[in-house]
Amino acid sequence: MTYNPGRRDSFKKMILGGAALGSLASLDFKQNPSLTLKGNINHGVCAWSMRPLSLEQLCAQIKSVGVGAIDLISPANWDLLKKYDIHCSMCNGAEISIADGFNETNFHAQLEKNYLELIPLVQKAGYKNVIAFSGNRRGMDDETGLKNCEIGIKKILSLAEKHGVILTMELLNSRVDHKDYMCDKSAWGIELCKRIASENFKLLFDIYHMQIDEGDIIRTIRNNHQYFGHYHTAGNPGRNDLDENQEINYPPIMQAIVDSGFNGYVSHEFIPKGENKIAALGHAVQVCDV
C-alpha cells in the first residue's frame, strides 16, 4: 500500500471527481457475462489504486471481472457499496496514519477512542476486517515496539472479540515505499500475533511489500498462514500490473494461499499502467485464478 498524497486524501479526491467522470465507466470496459472463475480465491480491489475511476464507477464495474469487494472504505461510503452489493473487505477510518500507530504510546488514547467507535459500526454493517498500522520506528527498537503495540491493541481487543471484528495490521516494506515503518518483516508481525494470542488480531500480508523486504513468499505463507487474515497483490518492481514485466510469480503463491485453507479476501492494490483500469483488474483476477 503506497500512496502520495495520503491514501485517504487521494480517495477523497477520487470520490469528488466521480461526477466529472460519469461517462468513463461505459468507455472502460464491456461486461463479460461469460466469465467463469474457479472460485477458490475471493477477489477484492483497493479503490485508491484504480483512480481516476470514482468509487461508484468501480462498484458498478468490478463484478463483471470477478471482483466482489473493495478494501479501505470508511463508514461514510458503506451505503454506496451496499447499493451495488459490494462487500467491504477491509474497513478503515480509525487509524491516525501509517507513520503514527500503535508502537508509540502517546497515540494510544486517540487510537483507542477511534477503534472503540468504529468496531461496533463494522459489526453492524456486516463487515469483519479493520486496518491497523504499527507506525514508524523513529529510532525505536523492535522489542519496545512490540511491547507498545501489544499494550495498545489489547485495549481494544475485547471489544473486537465481542463484535467478531478482526484487527488487521499491515506488513509494509521499508526499503522503497514506507521508510522507517516498523512492521516491515513478517517475523516481527508474527511475534506480535503470538503475544496478543487472539483470532481477532491478524496480519495483512501484502505480497508486493514482502517481496521487496524479504522474499520467500510461498514458504512464509505455508509456515505462518494462521497469522494472515488478508492479502494484497501488486507487481514488483513498480507496483503495477500483474503482467510479464514484473517478477512475482502469482499463480503458485495463490495456490499456497488456497492450500492453506484461507477463505478471506485477496485484494488487488496495483496501479494499472494503461487507461483501461477494469481490464487490468480483470487480467489480475485471471492470473490469480487457481
Residue ranges of each PLM-predicted region?
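N-terminal small/glycine-rich loop or linker at the start of catalytic domains
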Residues: 34-46, 90-101, 135-137
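Active-site-adjacent beta->alpha loops and helix N-cap segments on the catalytic face
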Residues: 78-82
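Mid-chain, structured segments of secreted extracytoplasmic proteins
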Residues: 86-115
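Histidine-acidic metal/acid-base catalytic patches
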Residues: 2-42, 47-63, 126-129, 183-205, ...
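Catalytic domains of carbohydrate-active enzymes, especially glycoside hydrolases
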Residues: 58-77
